Amino acid sequence: AKGEVSPLAMETSGHGALKDNYFLDDGAFLAVKLVIALAQAAHQGKKLDSLIEKLPPLVEEGEYRFKINDDDFKSYGTKVLEEFKKRATDAGYQMPQSYEGIRLSFKGEDVQGWILLRMSLHDPVMPMNIEGARKGDLAKLKEIAKKLTDGFEKLDRSSLE
């Protein structure tokens, strides 16, 4: 988001980039950085996982890939994103700034977590990532996602079922 320092850019696919390397998607650079971190941790009597021990645990998550059955998949996907955003806005869902697609954030008593719907850069696919903060939240978030993506005839949402 605007105004936040982010030295790491990470994709759900596992691709990552570091500010130290001009945010280039460079797996070899990341691997070397991890080996260095491992050596430093070992020197301090720690393991590599000590670097992430303060992160909150991942409780429930899922990735769903919706195939777009349209020759002009980019235009169709753009329409889906626009309508998804409109439906989410109409429902009053929180939408933090996102440069990757449409991200919804849920912090209520009933459900906690997030949903991200985006376009694939190269394929006729719309990946949706969902993360629930507590046990049972994933199922609730999937139901919300189903409602928000209902009615798109050329969007195969069968992976969400």
Cite the ranges covered by each PLM segment:
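Phosphate-binding and adjacent anionic-ligand microenvironments
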Residues: 1-161
